[in-house]
Amino acid sequence: IAWITPNDLSGNENKMFISHGERDITRSGLDNSSAVLMPKHSLLLSTRAPIGYLAISNNEICTNQGFKSIVPNAGYHGYFIYYLLKRNVSAIAQQGVGTTFKEVSKDTLSNFAVPLPSKILANNFAEKVTPLCEKRCVLEEENRELERLRDWLMPMLMNGQARVE
């Protein structure tokens, strides 16, 4: 099961989606911890060390305590919530408290007020951006696959195990 930490999003700033992190958690590890399995399309907002990384899960995932995960419901579409959070991430980060590491608590995030449009307007927005976001998801996954292929092939080319003709 994919285990996502804020560190996994540190190189993900220009990406909207995430499917895997550096590590995984086993079913046993999940069952014997306070971790929760989050559904596909959950929004992941890092709320400590550092505050403000944001992504949408491409599959079921678990996160560490550095995140507040949001599961969109019937009220507002997930893509609308994503862009709403993205627009307000600096203001959310300013709400962080702590001496060693700043953190935004669940209560602080729950009470963070933003003006909301009507659900009709928000749904119209989501209707327009959904095809674009879905295409972006496909392109990001293709880029990740190309990066994996490059990382596998480059050492082989460098040490002579493979040649390009």
Regions found by a protein language model. Give the residues of each.
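Amphipathic alpha-helical coiled-coil/heptad-repeat segments
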Residues: 75-76, 80-83, 87-91, 95-102, ...
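DNA target-recognition domains and sequence-specific DNA-contacting regions of bacterial/archaeal
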Residues: 1-116
